[in-house]
């Protein structure tokens, strides 16, 4: 089951235009994801009381300790100890035997007010529609018609494998599972005039934290039968699919005990699994004035709307901003040759249908609601409960 890869697998890429692509995901108990979820839980706690809160909350976690640091200006009164501990409890670290315990961990708080230099140029004395970007930067949105969600199959499968393990852990069906997990999926694709079509799953990798009282053989069997076969459509699996299940052989020490965690270190997991492009800015712990988050959501909204409207089969949208300036500096569209329209024509469609000022994005996508903790695991995109995943009906 954990055999060597056969060279570069050239035998499976003999078809013209065939290639392989890999994406990874991590579970709720991965230390970096713990931090993302805590940062967004803090953001939600403020937005519940003050929808106009300005939040930039970073989290660090290590054995027995959580540190909150950042800048927050808000009318809300938030019990940070409670927010942190409830988040860790929900994730599943509720006993010191697991290496981390919400009841006994130390919570340190180093949060200050937002810099008045930033406030005066971004939102003070401005109408909401004219709120400036909270910083400079470039953001990307991507969409592809290879799945109903307009997401790459590689990242969707990787997320679903982690979600399935969390489901089996919480239901008690696989009681040996612990919260920390990682998955990785390699898919063999073929190209069709710039669009990509998944043909088969080439490799699946799963590493998950576990109890002492389970054999490696039993873990591998359960992961294949109850996780992979429940998630990956049978048409993508064949006798040549490679499985690396618990390849380290042992993963008892996990979560913050195994590795330190920091907010914002899983930006590719959070987005498109390496497809498209990334501007470098993380999402979690940031309110809508931080265009790292809001503009990336808007760019995804634009990209998915273009694909669902049939204007292209695959598209990458880039936007850029300057601090204190409301209007984006640039909007760029790349369709990989999958559109009957020129990219200039598509840009005209985007400009007629979307207003990408932060103060308008927040209104159109309802970004003052406390919805963010849900985004902080299993990806920010490809999930129908979020407003930016509902394609806009385009006028063109």
Curated annotation (Swiss-Prot):
Record keywords: ATP-binding, Disulfide bond, Magnesium, Metal-binding, Nucleotide-binding, One-carbon metabolism, Potassium, S-nitrosylation, Transferase
GO cellular component: cytosol
Molecular-function GO terms, alphabetical: ATP binding; metal ion binding; methionine adenosyltransferase activity
Enzyme Commission number(s) from the entry: 2.5.1.6
Pfam family, one: S-AdoMet_synt_N
Annotated segments matching region Flexible loop: 114-126
Catalytic activity: L-methionine + ATP + H2O = S-adenosyl-L-methionine + phosphate + diphosphate
InterPro entries given in the database record: ADOMET_SYNTHASE_CS, S-AdoMet_synt_C, S-AdoMet_synt_central, S-AdoMet_synt_N, S-AdoMet_synthetase, S-AdoMet_synthetase_sfam
Residue positions where S-nitrosocysteine is found in the record: 121
Positions with a binding annotation for L-methionine: 71, 114, 259, 290
Biological process according to GO: methionine catabolic process; one-carbon metabolic process; S-adenosylmethionine biosynthetic process
Role this protein plays: Catalyzes the formation of S-adenosylmethionine from methionine and ATP. The reaction comprises two steps that are both catalyzed by the same enzyme: formation of S-adenosylmethionine (AdoMet) and triphosphate, and subsequent hydrolysis of the triphosphate.
Official protein name in the record: S-adenosylmethionine synthase isoform type-1
Taxonomic source organism: Bos taurus (Bovine)
Gene name of this polypeptide: MAT1A
């Amino acid at each position: 089951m954990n055999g060597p890869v056969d060279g570069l697998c050239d035998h499976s890429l003999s078809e013209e235009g065939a290639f392989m692509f890999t994406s990874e995901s991590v579970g709720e108990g991965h230390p970096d994801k713990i931090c993302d979820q805590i940062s967004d839980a803090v953001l939600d706690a403020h937005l519940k009381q003050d929808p106009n809160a300005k939040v930039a909350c970073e989290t660090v976690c290590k054995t027995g300790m959580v540190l909150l640091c950042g800048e927050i200006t808000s009318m809300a009164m938030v019990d940070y100890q409670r927010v942190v501990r409830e988040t860790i409890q929900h994730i599943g670290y509720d006993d010191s035997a697991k290496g981390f315990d919400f009841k006994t961990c130390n919570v340190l708080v180093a949060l200050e007010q937002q810099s008045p230099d930033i406030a005066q140029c971004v939102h003070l004395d401005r109408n909401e529609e004219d709120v400036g970007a909270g910083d400079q930067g470039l953001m990307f949105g991507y969409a592809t018609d290879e799945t109903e969600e307009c997401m790459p199959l590689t990242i969707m499968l990787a997320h679903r494998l982690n979600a399935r393990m969390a489901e089996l852990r919480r239901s008690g069906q696989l009681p040996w599972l612990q919260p920390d997990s990682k998955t990785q999926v390699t898919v063999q694709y073929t190209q069709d005039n710039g669009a990509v079509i998944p043909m088969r799953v080439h490799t699946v990798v799963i590493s998950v934290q576990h109890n002492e009282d389970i054999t490696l053989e039993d873990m591998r069997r359960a992961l294949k039968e109850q996780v992979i076969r429940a998630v990956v459509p049978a048409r993508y699996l064949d006798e040549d699919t490679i499985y690396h299940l618990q390849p380290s052989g042992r993963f008892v020490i996990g979560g913050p005990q195994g590795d330190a965690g920091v907010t914002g270190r899983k930006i590719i997991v959070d987005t498109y699994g390496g497809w498209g492009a990334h501007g470098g800015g993380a999402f979690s712990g940031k309110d809508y004035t931080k265009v790292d988050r809001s503009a990336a959501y808007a760019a995804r909204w634009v990209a998915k709307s273009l694909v669902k409207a049939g204007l292209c089969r695959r598209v990458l949208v880039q936007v850029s901003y300057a601090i204190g300036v409301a209007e984006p500096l640039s909007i760029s569209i790349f369709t990989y040759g999958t559109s009957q329209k020129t990219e200039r024509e598509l840009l005209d469609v985007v400009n007629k249908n979307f207003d990408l000022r932060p103060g308008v994005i927040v209104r159109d996508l309802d970004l003052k609601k406390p919805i963010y903790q849900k985004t902080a695991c299993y990806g920010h995109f490809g999930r129908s409960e979020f407003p930016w995943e509902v394609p806009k009906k385009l006028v063109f």
